[in-house]
Amino acid sequence: MKKRIYAPATIANFGPGFDVFGMAIEEPGDEVIVKESDSFEIEVEGYDVPRDENNVAVISAKALFKMVGEEGGVKIRLKKGVRPKSGLGSSGASSVAGALAAARVLGVDNDELIIMAALEGEKAASGSPHGDNVIPSYYGGFNILESLNPLRVHRVDVELNVVVVLPEVEVPTKEARRIVPEKVPLKDAIKNLAMASSLVLALKEGDIETVGRLLDDNLALPYRKKLMPWFDEVRKAGLEAGAYGVTVSGSGPSLFAIGENLKDIGKAMKEKFEELGIRAEFWITKTGRGAKWY
């Protein structure tokens, strides 16, 4: 019997929470139709991603089979709705969908096993099994990753409206991770700790203006901006249009903003991209549910 799985896109880092904060959004997402098979097969619709066993959905599905010691496989039909190299957790969504596809076939309902399998797909895509896309895509909402081993995740109950602006440029995740130094100045680490702690409190209190003010980062963004030379100008356009805060989603190039008039903010940022010779699109979305099957 065929089973369907949907895994949403995500906003990782969420300002100062490098590799720790992540929020699912309502759209876009990846959908998988899966059925049991003697081997691992995949068909892909939508964005161009590997159509063989190098696809992260297959890697994650295989990982779960191996973890539980089962033979066999799955046939996956992936409707790829999250653009690769967009900063919206494309590989994370496919990895979650693939791991859940295997879980539905195998009858596995252990969250930690499914997440660990999905992280194998994320590792293959980005070079690092970071969980700030996989975990919010799986659980939904706003998540704080305390640790992966053992898996400890904290969730903040929040419904946040955001505008996402996606330019027609790519920032490969592996390159965006490589460019971040292993060590940063102590003052930058202290600043990020202060911003991250304050942002969580502001989210819990519903203080969206303060959340916006804290959408900044001293650990990764100063280095990643070298891959996004347009960032400062587009951010300024969003702030001038009334945004409380604007920053990068994940490793970029997508940006997100919060504020009162999200349509005006998105339009201003899109127009600034176009002034710089870069096509872009924007859409308004909000905190999303996690992966689901039906």
UniProtKB/Swiss-Prot annotation:
Its EC number is 2.7.1.39. This is Homoserine kinase. Gene3D superfamilies: 3.30.230.10, GHMP kinase, C-terminal domain. Belongs to the GHMP kinase family. Homoserine kinase subfamily. It is an enzyme of class 2 (transferase). It catalyses: L-homoserine + ATP = O-phospho-L-homoserine + ADP + H(+). GO terms for biological process: threonine biosynthetic process. Keywords: Amino-acid biosynthesis, ATP-binding, Cytoplasm, Kinase, Nucleotide-binding, Threonine biosynthesis, Transferase. The gene is thrB. InterPro entries: GHMP_kinase_C_dom, GHMP_kinase_C_sf, GHMP_kinase_N_dom, Homoserine_kinase, Ribosomal_Su5_D2-typ_SF, Ribsml_uS5_D2-typ_fold_subgr. One of its GO terms (cellular component) is cytoplasm. GO terms for molecular function: ATP binding; homoserine kinase activity. Pathway: Amino-acid biosynthesis; L-threonine biosynthesis; L-threonine from L-aspartate: step 4/5. Catalyzes the ATP-dependent phosphorylation of L-homoserine to L-homoserine phosphate. It is found in: Cytoplasm. ATP binds at R83, P84, K85, S86, G87, L88, G89, S90, S91, G92, A93.
